[in-house]
Amino acid sequence: MSSMTLFILFVSIIALLFLFINLIFAPHNPYQEKYSIFECGFHSFLGQNRTQFGVKFFIFALVYLLLDLEILLTFPFAVSEYVNNIYGLIILLGFITIITIGFVYELGKSALKIDSRQVITMTRFNYSSTIEYLGKI
């Protein structure tokens, strides 16, 4: 057998061994809340899993994926820059321009603004602006 085959076999055996050890020695405390649906920013209680939630979390995730794909698609250009010449540069700049226009559009529509559920009450304070409030902290 070659060294690469032995390496893959060894890593697979070690991974399965660690999974088996974890299965044996890890604490197991099942209860209903662990199996309930979890969404960041929302608390699920027993019997109340059908709560409404905003689509903004999914939009935020999609924007992250698009920008991540932008990095993945521009990386080959950076690696093979000496082969691409000016034609590849024009295509890359057009691609980045399209992604940037979409990102600016989403910023303009406030699609990336996620409302915080933690409200700071400033009723007993008499500050005219947020900057004045933060300056007192």
Curated annotation (Swiss-Prot):
Q: Where in the cell is it found?
A: Mitochondrion membrane
- Taxonomy, superkingdom: Eukaryota
Q: Under which EC number(s) is this enzyme classified?
A: 7.1.1.2
Single GO molecular function:
NADH dehydrogenase (ubiquinone) activity
Regarding protein family, the annotation reads: Belongs to the complex I subunit 3 family.
Look up keyword Lipoprotein and say if it applies.
no
EC main group: translocase
Q: Which InterPro entries match?
A: NADH_UbQ/plastoQ_OxRdtase_su3, NDAH_ubi_oxred_su3_sf
Q: Does the keyword Translocase apply?
A: yes
Q: Can you state which reaction this protein catalyses? A: a ubiquinone + NADH + 5 H(+)(in) = a ubiquinol + NAD(+) + 4 H(+)(out)
Q: How does it sit in the membrane?
A: Multi-pass membrane protein
Residue ranges of coiled coil: none
According to UniProt, the name of this protein is: NADH-ubiquinone oxidoreductase chain 3
Function text: Core subunit of the mitochondrial membrane respiratory chain NADH dehydrogenase (Complex I) that is believed to belong to the minimal assembly required for catalysis. Complex I functions in the transfer of electrons from NADH to the respiratory chain. The immediate electron acceptor for the enzyme is believed to be ubiquinone.
Please give the start and end residues of each transmembrane region: 6-26, 57-77, 86-106
GO cellular component: a single term: NADH dehydrogenase complex
Q: In which organism is this protein found?
A: Podospora anserina (strain S / ATCC MYA-4624 / DSM 980 / FGSC 10383)
Q: Which UniProt keywords apply?
A: Electron transport, Membrane, Mitochondrion, NAD, Respiratory chain, Translocase, Transmembrane, Transmembrane helix, Transport, Ubiquinone
